[in-house]
Amino acid sequence: MNFCPKCSSAEIVKKIPEGDNRERDVCNKCEEIFYSNPNIVTGVLAYTDNDEILLCKRSIEPRHGYWTLPAGFLENQESIEEGALRETEEEAKLQVSDVKLFTVLSVPHIDQIYTFFTGKVVNYDFGPTPESSEVKLFKYDEIPWSELAFPSVIKTIKLFLEHGDDKIFNEVLRPKV
């Protein structure tokens, strides 16, 4: 942060504000405190009655060329479900029904929170988009595990295959040391 959005001062310093316990960006002129919060990623695990899930091959970084569930960053003024459905349309041209919250995954080492919903594939007119070079249904036993982009996607798919979507999972993912 270079300038205070409240008073336009360039006097932004890092310090622990009175009554707080974490270092924050603070304007030295007007004393405005600026909080940096985790980003929320939201998406959909889309499935069919034929034991298939939909995956998108990423055509953008990070993890270009790897498979993922359609997902992306939540925008201001949208609910996590609205964001998940928007991202699913943007990345796969897909609509889903019977949408249910499925996983909430905290990933503290990268300051992100992932929320995945499950949803039943409604239209089979899905296809590639600027963000996905390929969009494909995979039988459960044909999922390309070694080509999946992110631990959050792997965890969500494994939980779905083990438990179906009758339960909500709330877990923390940490890097292996």
Annotate each predicted stretch with a short phrase.
Residues 48, 74-159, 167-169:
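Unchanged
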